[in-house]
């Protein structure tokens, strides 16, 4: 609430002025999805992510508590998680989202990083995954069930209420998308000198 960082422009200026005074915090360790968001923001600011200060917490709730207490200056977690904390009374400010377009719901007024002039996108994809030994028939049955569910008005309403962007891939299309994202992640991990299991 009392943070001098009120916009992405302020955040970038603070990082450039003295990166040691800008501590990122999130649920997840170095190399995690939330760390990657912080690293991409640091890189967009001209800072080598290896020089970035990052505190890993057990989860987003702990990180948001640390943010409110001034122990970290930036929370690089899920927008939907921040939204729930704001609804519960947390005094935090969402600066931008890393999706390709604005979210719906209560976060619809929050700009994307791209809108603000930073080519940074890192949407978190949530899904249900099955093991490799599941039969084709069972895989298709589950895929069809999720496809039908995601086409309902009730699902669309719930998704919008949770600040989640529209994303309705299932089956082979989702599998291909995840493999493409993993290739991007592996390249970024190599750029950031992280080791990734093959």
Name each model feature, range by range.
Residues 15, 40, 61-75, 80-90, ...:
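Short helices/loops that flank or line small-molecule/ion binding pockets
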Residues 1-62, 66, 113, 125-158:
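Hinge/capping helix and adjacent helix->loop/strand transition within the periplasmic-binding protein
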């Amino acid at each position: 609430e009392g943070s001098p960082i009120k916009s992405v422009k302020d955040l970038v200026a603070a990082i450039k002025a003295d990166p040691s005074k800008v501590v990122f915090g999130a649920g997840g360790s170095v190399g995690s999805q939330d760390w990657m968001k912080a690293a991409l923001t640091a890189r967009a600011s001209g800072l080598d992510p290896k020089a970035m200060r990052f505190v890993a917490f057990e989860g987003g709730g702990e990180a948001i508590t640390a943010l409110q207490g001034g122990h970290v200056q930036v929370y690089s977690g899920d927008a939907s998680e921040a939204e729930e904390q704001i609804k519960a009374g947390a005094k935090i400010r969402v600066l931008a989202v890393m999706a390709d377009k604005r979210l719906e719901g209560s976060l619809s007024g929050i700009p994307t990083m791209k809108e603000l002039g930073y080519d940074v996108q890192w949407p978190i994809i949530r899904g249900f995954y099955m093991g490799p030994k599941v039969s084709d028939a069972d895989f298709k049955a589950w895929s069809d069930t999720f496809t039908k569910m995601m086409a309902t008005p009730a699902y669309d309403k719930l998704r919008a209420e949770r600040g989640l962007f529209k994303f309705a891939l299932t089956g082979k299309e989702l599998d291909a998308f995840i493999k493409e994202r993993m290739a991007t992640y592996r390249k970024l991990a190599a750029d950031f000198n992280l080791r990734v299991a093959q």
